[in-house]
């Protein structure tokens, strides 16, 4: 009869061996994962020059970008995946403390694996395009350089996240699997580039907003203070003014730029969003119609 540690070790090794054929190297210093016939998911920041995709058996094929979301750091490659099975997606959400395994094949080298725990959920970070990406999964699985784009799997070997980069605290951040990621991957696989919506305002930090309202004798209120409005932009056309305090988007309270970005991103497909602003002491409901800008992936203010 084996020890609990021995049984855990064997189980982890079995999961790694089962997922290994789906893990690929991308370019000179990245990784990816096969998610369908002819499709590989990786990070957008791995797309440099000609994209060589290296498989478990050593075969190298040239990948073509089906779709890329620079702001969201996600890309789908079209490549011959013959002989490499697609990794199954998890159908549930991971929990804090759950055991996960990070896998990679940095730059087409040997398979690398690390076992760790989910250490954080809903983490925000700056994407390669400089915009905020929200909702990341943080885990403690130790990974080598070049692991970005590789999969994070659960104890059943199912995909629960796509590694994107190391956090400043030594942990790794991953884009979590869920309905939103699946929809984004499907769209990118079809060659549909995401588009970002622009509100067209400059915002003061929440602390500044509270101090300014207090200074002019207005009651303190959580929200984002508009200190400049772009002429003829969506906010200007909707009637938002300098000094307005944005307190909700789509019925959800906003107290940070990240929450505003999330709300605007959710409204992107519809092309409009309902905002509530406080002007002085009055609450105003304002409907904003967005102008669509160049392909991107996250909302901007």
PLM regions and their residue ranges:
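Conserved PDZ fold ligand-binding element
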Residues: 39-41, 160, 235-258
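Active-site region of chymotrypsin-like
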Residues: 20-22, 75, 79-88, 112-184, ...
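Short, small/polar residue-rich loop motifs at catalytic or cofactor-binding pockets
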Residues: 27-29, 144-148, 223, 232-233, ...
């Amino acid at each position: 009869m084996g020890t609990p540690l021995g049984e855990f070790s064997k189980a982890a090794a079995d999961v790694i061996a089962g997922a290994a054929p789906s893990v690929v190297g991308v370019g000179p210093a990245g990784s990816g994962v096969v998610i369908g016939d002819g499709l590989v998911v990786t990070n957008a920041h791995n797309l440099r020059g000609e994209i060589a995709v290296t498989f478990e058996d050593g075969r190298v094929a040239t990948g073509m970008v089906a779709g890329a979301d620079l702001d969201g750091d996600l890309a789908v490659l079209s490549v011959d995946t013959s002989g490499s099975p697609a990794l199954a997606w998890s159908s549930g959400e991971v929990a804090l403390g759950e055991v996960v395994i990070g896998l990679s094949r940095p730059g087409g080298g040997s398979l690398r694996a690390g076992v760790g725990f989910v250490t954080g959920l809903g983490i925000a970070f700056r994407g390669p395009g400089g915009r905020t990406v929200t909702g990341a999964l943080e885990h403690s699985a130790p990974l080598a350089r070049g692991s970005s784009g590789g999969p994070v799997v659960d104890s059943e070997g199912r995909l629960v996240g796509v590694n994107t980069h190391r956090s400043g605290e030594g942990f790794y951040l991953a884009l979590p699997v869920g309905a939103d990621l699946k929809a984004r991957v499907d769209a990118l696989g079809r060659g549909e580039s995401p588009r970002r919506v622009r509100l067209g305002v400059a915002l003061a930090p929440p602390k500044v907003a509270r101090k300014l309202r207090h200074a002019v004798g207005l009651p303190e209120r959580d929200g984002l203070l508009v200190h400049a409005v772009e002429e003829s932009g969506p906010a200007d056309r909707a009637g938002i003014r300098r000094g307005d305090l944005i307190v909700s988007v789509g019925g959800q309270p906003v107290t940070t730029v990240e929450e505003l970005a999330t709300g605007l991103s959710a409204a992107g497909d519809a092309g409009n969003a309902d905002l509530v602003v406080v002007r002085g002491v009055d609450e105003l409901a304002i409907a904003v119609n967005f102008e669509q800008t160049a392909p991107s992936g996250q909302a901007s203010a």
